[in-house]
Curated annotation (Swiss-Prot):
It catalyses: 2 [4-(deca-1,8-diyl)-2,5-dioxo-2,5-dihydro-3-furanyl]acetate + H(+) = 2-[(1R,8S,14R,15R)-11-hydroxy-14,15-bis[(6E)-oct-6-en-1-yl]-3,5,9-trioxo-4,10-dioxatetracyclo[9.4.0.0(2,6).0(8,12)]pentadeca-2(6),12-dien-8-yl]acetate + CO2. Glycans are attached at N146, N195, N217. It comes from Talaromyces stipitatus (strain ATCC 10500 / CBS 375.48 / QM 6759 / NRRL 1006) (Penicillium stipitatum). Belongs to the dimerizing cyclase tstC family. Phomoidrides A and B (also known as CP-225,917 and CP-263,114) are potent inhibitors of Ras farnesyltransferase and squalene synthase. CP-225,917 and CP-263,114 inhibit Ras farnesyl transferase from rat brain with IC(50) values of 6 uM and 20 uoM, respectively. CP-225,917 inhibits squalene synthase with an IC(50) value of 43 uM and CP-263,114 with an IC(50) of 160 uM. Dimerizing cyclase; part of the gene cluster that mediates the biosynthesis of the antihypercholesterolemic agents phomoidrides which are dimeric anhydrides. Within the pathway, tstC produces the bicyclo[4.3.1]deca-1,6-diene core of phomoidrides via the dimerization of the monomeric anhydrides leading to prephomoidride. The pathway begins with the highly reducing polyketide synthase tstA that catalyzes the formation of a C12-fatty acyl-ACP, starting from one acetate and 5 malonate units. The hydrolase tstM is involved in the release of the C12-fatty acyl chain from phiA. Its EC number is 5.-.-.-. The lineage of its organism: Eukaryota, Fungi, Dikarya, Ascomycota, Pezizomycotina. This is Dimerizing cyclase tstC.
């Protein structure tokens, strides 16, 4: 087994047994909204599982809760449960969007970069809900993030993760949705440079969404590709 939190394999069965936890979790701190425009989110004082079953083929909802709920203290926590060949697709049209072929690149280019824009690299992250999982390979996690930016501005973000798990409790595939406008505004306001500066050494072509010019295949430039 790859995860210390797995309890055991059922003998003679392909099901995975995860540590039993109550069907509700009551230790969540109330969310304190920093939004100028919204009242405090209608966030429950305790987390209720749609399916509290822990005798599961894949991962149970209580196990998913324990795995993802620590992201506020450790941004890397999510990727501790990533398969080495995990593929991540960040949906939308913004600097984080794209298809990542390994978890390390996805983490550095998104969560790590975003975390560096937040004061003291601290963020309050909570789960709104968990759907699916258990005997289904796919699960959906709804997150709410709350922090203060390096410039002292209140910051909020809601994110949706759609995850495919294997029978060892590792994530094999992720599609995630974020607020593109919030991401772009946060990077623009809090990064000293926006993807590049005169201190960056460029060794790869970065032509933008339009791709390389047609002349690239007719000159020595084409031989370098």
């Amino acid at each position: 087994m790859r995860l210390s939190t797995l309890s055991s394999l059922l003998l003679g069965s392909s099901s995975i047994v995860f540590a039993r936890v109550p069907p509700t979790v009551d230790n969540q701190e109330p969310i304190k909204s920093t939004s100028y425009f919204l009242d405090d989110p209608d966030f429950p004082s305790h987390f209720e599982f749609e399916n509290p079953e822990t005798n599961c083929k894949y991962v149970s909802q209580p196990w998913i809760y324990n795995a993802f709920n620590s992201v506020s203290e450790d941004m890397e926590a999510v990727f501790k449960y990533a398969h080495p060949d995990l593929h991540v697709r960040i949906m939308g049209h913004h600097p984080f969007a794209g298809y990542y072929h390994n978890p390390k690149m996805a983490f550095v280019n998104s969560l790590w970069r975003l975390n560096n824009c937040l004061k003291d690299a601290k963020v309050d992250a909570k789960l709104w809900a968990i759907h699916g999982g258990c005997d289904q390979a796919w699960s959906v996690q709804e997150f709410y993030f709350n922090a203060t930016t390096n410039k002292g501005q209140p910051w909020e973000l809601t994110s949706l993760w759609v995850s495919r798990w294997d029978e060892d409790g590792l994530i094999r595939e992720v599609r995630t949705w974020v607020d593109a406008g919030q991401i772009m505004r946060t990077l623009w306001d809090n990064e000293i440079w926006f993807n590049s500066s005169d201190r960056v050494h460029h060794y790869d072509f970065i032509p933008g969404p339009g791709g390389l010019p047609p002349i690239a295949n007719k000159t020595e430039l084409g031989g370098e590709l």
